[in-house]
Amino acid sequence: MALLEDLASVEPEAPECSGGRETWRAATARQILRRNLYGVDLAPESVEIARLSLWIRSAIRNQTLTDLTHNIVQGNSVISDPAVDPRAFDWQVQFSEVFADGGFDAVIGNPPYVRQELLGSIKPRLQQEFPSVYNGLADLYVYFYDRGLQILKPGGMLAYVTTNKWMKAGYGEALRRTLARMHDLRRIVDFGHAKQFFPDADVFPCFAVVQKGVEEGDGEALIEDTLEPERSRLLDARNQAEAIDVGIIPRDLVRLDDLPAQIARSSFHIHRARLGSDAWSLERQEVHELLEKIRRSGAPLLEVTGAKPTRGILTGLNEAFLIDTTTRDRLVGKDSKCAPLIQAYLRGQDICRWLPDWAGLWMIALKSSGDHPWPWADLGDQAEACFRHTYPSLHEHLKPFEADLKRRQDQGRHWWELRACAYWELFTRPKIVYQEIQYHPAYAYDEESNLCNNKVFFLCTDYLVLLGILNSPAVWWHNWRYLPHMKDEALTPVAFLLESLLVPKLKRRFERLCGDICRHLLICSRDRRTTIRIVLDWLRTQHDVQKPSTRLQAATNLSSDEFVSEVKRSRGRERSMSAAALKDLRDEYARTIEPAKNLMAEALQLEYQLHDLVNEAYGLTPNEVKLMWDTAPPRMPIPRPPHV
């Protein structure tokens, strides 16, 4: 308000006067700098750069530069106690003239992204200063939201560019609750994993505009003198506003040279009542209603199966404990007693849809003495000698890693042991395995007692119907809007969200049918994989294709001509093939690959049946199924069914 009054009283010189308009603009900028613009940054160099930039914009020839030492200052914006940080900054003391008027009218910022692991020493203070949004796993920018709102006057506006993680992550629950209940969200624009804003950073930018809520009591006293004419309007707006302006711009479509127009074109409104402490969904109303319908169907996964998402083994030093088949055979050849301790394991990249694709890798599963009664468990200084005598080849293999193994945080009672684990026995049971980070919808059934590394999670259950539901298009469509997004728009099925996923109740007849379909799809996947291995072995031995291309590793997706062309390309131009060799390729295709392609066609029809069964279990109408496919995310597990 003061700025508007100042501007109204300034009469610019006539345009024809030399430098008149420029002088007026510079004078106006100086007024703004002195009375209206404030800034705080932790880095002194950033403070100097900001001051310099503002001086350049406001300098007037032959006049002293505006003194910015009070307005643009160094300090820790979120810590006010100098005992915690000597750079602590007390906003109300340092900018007392602003708070004499109730606080700032606007706060604009791009808070730093500092992971919570680096905040350990100041977390107790953060909890004191920001109790309404504090979470021990929250990254630093969460507290900047609360600080920005604290220093605003009621009705003031906050605009931040931050990561979008707070909208879905567990640590953002308190912040979501605070923003939804205490303040007025005006606009949110989500850019996904856009790289255009900060090319050198791996970020998920979003833009949020929030109006500070008008409070009773103290809030009213602060603004009644200067904003009384506005008070009724602000309160009415809070009570009556039902819509928030939302924009979602896919990362590949972001154009910085056209951003305002893009935001305007992509904008739509959502009901304010949709947003609370649960993960936020910024979807159009019809999509939101479909999401809600899915989320009301059935019971939580944990309740249905009793299976909690469980992580694979964290070794602390993979190069010591994870070995290939050649190494495994060498160790067992030297000491056959160690064979039961070397077990097959699955990595994240081995998890394929329906069945895992074991890569011939092994884990030395030396459990902690706290979990297993090893003969050396309680021998103290003699423990290593006992281990060396009991399993000489394992000791010989691990000894070169001793120094690194001793430095592990994740270790057992002795340096050669894995960390304590209470669920070793679960690995021997049938289980559904899935990746920690999912680029594709891939849940696999493992009944081979495979171990898993820490990039794999599992659900200890033999309920194949659940496998079918998790692999369905409906659940991928839902999870795209439910699970946190990672780099390259991969999803992370964090445990507390996955165990809360609503699993629909199928009628008994449909449940049997769904289970039968899943069993057939497991067989199809196994047969396809066997075919691929047979073909690759044949190509290696008969046609010297030692490094098959990615396309050859999915030979059942190729036509006969494509198969021949890909073999020729893999062999290289300098190695031509005779007519007899080319005929041999086509004969092998007809003999081995063609039947597998037919089997895959049958599998696709089974997938379509499963698609319909799961949709029916969720109670979806034909129009809702069409909407699901019309708004399908990338990488749906199957092609759109012809009947949709």
Role assignments for model-derived ranges:
Residues 11-15, 63-68, 411-416, 485-487, ...:
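Short, glycine/acidic-rich hinge or "gate" loops at secondary-structure transitions
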Residues 15-25, 32, 417-419, 483-488, ...:
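Active-site-adjacent structural elements in folded domains
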Residues 4, 42-84, 91-336, 443-456, ...:
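Signature of N6-adenine DNA methyltransferases within the class I
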Residues 3-32, 58-71, 126:
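Flexible phosphate/Mg2+-sensing switch loops adjacent to catalytic phosphate-binding sites
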Residues 36-37:
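Short beta-strand element of Class I
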Residues 276-281, 297-303, 393, 505-644:
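Non-catalytic DNA-recognition/assembly elements of restriction-modification systems
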Residues 2-6, 10, 41, 45, ...:
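Generic, well-ordered alpha-helical scaffold segments in large soluble proteins
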Residues 142, 149, 260-261, 267-519, ...:
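Polybasic, glycine- and aromatic-enriched phosphate-binding surface used to engage nucleic acids
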